[in-house]
Amino acid sequence: MKQHRLRIKGPAGAIETVLDLPAGPPRGVALIAHPHPLHGGSLDNKVVATLAKAALAGGEVAVRANFRGVGATAGEYDAGIGETEDLLTVAQAVQAAFPDLPWRLLGFSFGAFVQHRVAARWPARQLILVGPALGRFDFAPPPIPAAIVHGADDELIPLAQVADYARAHAIPLRVIPGASHFFHGKLM
């Protein structure tokens, strides 16, 4: 794996971005979004790092960016609006280097909300919502094919709420037995 740390010019200033390249020719791009920036979320979050490892194992370029006000990313928290614009900016910059690869959008918690918004404006083939912050943010029906991964013992977002959303929108749901919101002890 080869890793590049970038600063991409965004609407509010520099966006700290990490690009992990697979060992062989890339088969796709996975844009991964972290949890809430006001609650310690960053591109180094353990769930986000696990998603990046899984993407790399599948031959995808793994792209992680810090939201506004986190790490070396400029700006301040913007309730998902500016964060959406920032991820779209990162996607455009990365697409210039990988113009013909298919995209997947992956987001954890607040990052799932932001990726849900990105999916309405970016030509990705799949949206993966991990521990989506349903009830805390507006999640309309996903605009592209989606899947959900959720902890059976999530203390922040009840599994029943996520199961109802998944059922209502015919979204495959994978429940991780014994997993909390942060998947303590359940990551690969």
What are these model-predicted stretches?
Residues M1-P25:
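N-terminal cap/lid segment of alpha/beta-hydrolase-fold proteins
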Residues A23-R64:
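Short, surface-exposed "cap/lid" segments of acyl-processing enzymes
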Residues G75, A179-M188:
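Catalytic histidine-centered segment of alpha/beta-hydrolase-like enzymes
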Residues Y77-A97:
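Alpha/beta-hydrolase active-site loop
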Residues L106-Q115:
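Gly/Ala-rich beta-loop-alpha elbow adjacent to hydrolase catalytic centers
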Residues P142, A146-H150, D154:
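Short beta-strand/loop motif that positions the catalytic acidic residue
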Residues A152-I157, H181-F182:
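Acidic catalytic loop of the alpha/beta-hydrolase fold
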Residues P158-A166, G178, M188:
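Short alpha-helix in the alpha/beta-hydrolase fold that links the catalytic acid
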